[in-house]
Amino acid sequence: MNSEPSWTATPSPGGTLPVPNATTPWLGRDEELAKVEIGILATVLVLATGGNLAVLLTLGRHGHKRSRMHLFVLHLALTDLGVALFQVLPQLLWDITYRFQGSDLLCRAVKYLQVLSMFASTYMLLAMTLDRYLAVCHPLRSLRQPSQSTYPLIAAPWLLAAILSLPQVFIFSLREVIQGSGVLDCWADFYFSWGPRAYITWTTMAIFVLPVAVLSACYGLICHEIYKNLKVKTQAGREERRGWRTWDKSSSSAVATAATRGLPSRVSSISTISRAKIRTVKMTFVIVLAYIACWAPFFSVQMWSVWDENAPNEDSTNVAFTISMLLGNLSSCCNPWIYMGFNSRLLPRSLSHHACCTGSKPQVHRQLSTSSLTSRRTTLLTHACGSPTLRLSLNLSLRAKPRPAGSLKDLEQVDGEATMETSIF
């Protein structure tokens, strides 16, 4: 038995990690399985490249100021495009040629970019979820200094991905598959027997287990905050309806008093969650579910292969390994369609026109679940339009209780954010 670690040149996915217990011979392979893999990779490449390019081109056409979600979707589409170009495409070419065709420098560069795209895509999704957590659970903190809270979250995934991918440069190299055979390939080389197990375990923890744990914690807190918000809104709605029923049985002066009491609580609810925010939370949640569904089989097979010494290596297992490794790439195909599903403006013009023609009439929604100071005043005046005396009393009551400058500024910021998010999603 060869003293070198028996790790094949078959990467996973796209040549990112070495795979043990391969059934293909050292100097041959299963051609039928290779054809299936080439077909799947070609399909994934076309779908991922086309979908993410469509999203990038659509977002690039918008001339207005980009919202936070706009920027995160833009960069997540960039990372998914990187998965297609730097991970799927090299593996597709590699499967066609069977052996790596290139220099040692190109081998190390390809391996580095393959894992970099995986790290960047995962951590950008994590940053997007953290941004939604801040927007829902700590809205004022993210609104007072939006640039200082957004750009670090966008830059951090790229920086971490660039650093954490560096081991690939030292692990992989162009070397002989069997000493003295003269057949070269881009393979991993571990000096210790426990090296593959340690490396794959670390990669699984860094790319899948820990991010999923953080994502779950964030969405648990987000759901708790939304539940509290809905409970407060329900109670406020009951009090407001009770106040208007009192107005039906009382004089106009009683109405002015009830309106004055209701106004501060309605306006000062800066922390209420807009429908636009809830919609972006739903979109991010669906992306997270797709990410877990696509990557869970891949990392499960990877961990099984290095921790179970009795892992079978029959042909059927090789097929299962190969299909599981390719499933992770589907995440980059799903994300663009999730964006388009939550925002018809990102659809191609032909599909968007078809949806407009066949769909129902668009409904007009409020940009905020809680109106601003101006819209609240208009609502009160609309209900009281039949009484000049009541209009005067309401105006006087509004002028008699001025809002602090800081609160009004916060309200304007909340309204601006909701408008921006509604225009994109």
Curated annotation (Swiss-Prot):
Classification via PANTHER family: NEUROPEPTIDE RECEPTOR-RELATED G-PROTEIN COUPLED RECEPTOR, VASOPRESSIN V1B RECEPTOR
SMART domains, sorted: DUF1856
SUPFAM superfamilies according to UniProt: Family A G protein-coupled receptor-like (SSF81321)
Glycosylated sites: 21
Compartment(s) where it occurs, according to its Swiss-Prot or TrEMBL record: Cell membrane
Gene Ontology MF annotations: identical protein binding; peptide hormone binding; vasopressin receptor activity
Transmembrane segments: 36-59, 72-93, 109-130, 152-173, 203-223, 285-304, 323-342
Region (Disordered): 1-21
Membrane topology: Multi-pass membrane protein
Cysteines joined through disulfide linkages: 107-186
Function: Receptor for arginine vasopressin. The activity of this receptor is mediated by G proteins which activate a phosphatidyl-inositol-calcium second messenger system.
Residues in compartment: Cytoplasmic: 60-71, 131-151, 224-284, 343-425
Segments in the Extracellular topological domain: 1-35, 94-108, 174-202, 305-322
GO cellular component terms listed in the entry, alphabetical order: dendrite; Golgi apparatus; plasma membrane
Residue spans of biased composition, Polar residues class: 1-13
Family statement drawn from the similarity comment of this UniProt entry: Belongs to the G-protein coupled receptor 1 family. Vasopressin/oxytocin receptor subfamily.
InterPro entries noted in UniProt: GPCR_Rhodpsn, GPCR_Rhodpsn_7TM, V1R_C, Vasoprsn_rcpt, Vprs_rcpt_V1B
Protein's name according to its UniProt entry: Vasopressin V1b receptor
GO biological process, one term: cellular response to hormone stimulus
Record's keyword terms, sorted: Cell membrane, Disulfide bond, G-protein coupled receptor, Glycoprotein, Membrane, Receptor, Transducer, Transmembrane, Transmembrane helix
